[in-house]
């Protein structure tokens, strides 16, 4: 969606924006920027270059790669092969990490490396400066400046960024950006307006969750993307004081191991504390000092369960083809906020439900900025135009609905294929905020049945237009909701499949135990047995009544 905003005063330059892909749903990030006479491509993470090839890409003047993640760089090698004359600019670390996206090919360095914090004139009148953006080693915030006579036009593209310091990369520094006042700011809205705990608090909670599971004698499986989060988790487990010297085996899947090897080659570009650690012991591979860390191949015969094991892998179906394939008790850790679709490749939720020796836990290790830090960055930069990309439509909508942004900036959130003109004027007219989405409905109360102690039910009917909202799929995933009072308002919350699975696991009982959890009439924590005095009531999983009927007998 793009908010049409009138701008009074003289239009100084032709700046326009055309996204070919604004997120994983489009096959990756690929953005085209027209700045003065120049046509500039910001990232190319497209799996299929067809939309780009249809737009005469041979006339592109420059390509910038913000960082090496697959959804920002996957299409660059194919693009370079077809148009080798077009320069692709990136940081040195990004150039080294990019080949990980094509593990089956020999990919020589094909990017032109730009230094940090040093403006470079790359075309007549056009300068570019790269600033470390956090999120991933080598990730860059790109500052473009075009000089046209007496006027300077400034565009900033954040790529993926994070203000917080991570284990292996320092966060984006705000001080050099303060008061830049770009004409256009293009930034990600990955986490929408969510407010997350501080990164160190997230790490503390993650370590506590790992500790709790290991104390139960269980092994841990972490399906993660191969670059970034995987190495963050391994470094955290290797260096945290609660794990130093502890007899735990860490295993890295094949693609994760390739990422670890690549990090070994960029140690000089990592934070000081990481370099100091690497001077005294290996950053990753170590079978001498606990916790041990070894690469894991497809041959499961190498997996030793003599000590508790933590397996971190992307290609986990090859490692764990079925729930019965591994001995011992296992807990699967899943991220609360998914950073890449590859976190969930072929994840078999139903298999976990069928095998009680497998449990599910979730964790939060955010590598993007939350809503609080997003607005902080915006207010420090003070742009005229604000273009949101790279996020779920509902999360982007949450950001563009903020009054503090609507009253100060011209907001845009275009879908793939929708061009946006960004006129630069000398005066700003506050845009009319979009109307809020309100869904009207009705409430019907069903009469109670005193004979069976049924308290009655309430049915809420809402307009069918609510189904068109992108949030509905997640809200209605299981068909189960929870309601609570918030002042005079009733708040409804959908129960996700993952949350329901955790509830089922926590309520499991031995099959020979006569309780509600093992009764054929136990549905969604309610009794549905017409001859039971508890019919229609919410019941505990360990409850019991005289008319119990076993699931096994049915």
Curated annotation (Swiss-Prot):
It comes from the Bacteria. It holds the Pfam family Lactamase_B_2. GO terms for molecular function: RNA endonuclease activity. SUPFAM superfamilies: Metallo-hydrolase/oxidoreductase. InterPro entries: MBL, Metallo-B-lactamas, RibonucZ/Hydroxyglut_hydro. Gene3D superfamilies: Ribonuclease Z/Hydroxyacylglutathione hydrolase-like. To M.jannaschii MJ0047, MJ0162 and MJ1236. This is Uncharacterized protein sll0514. It comes from Synechocystis sp. (strain ATCC 27184 / PCC 6803 / Kazusa).
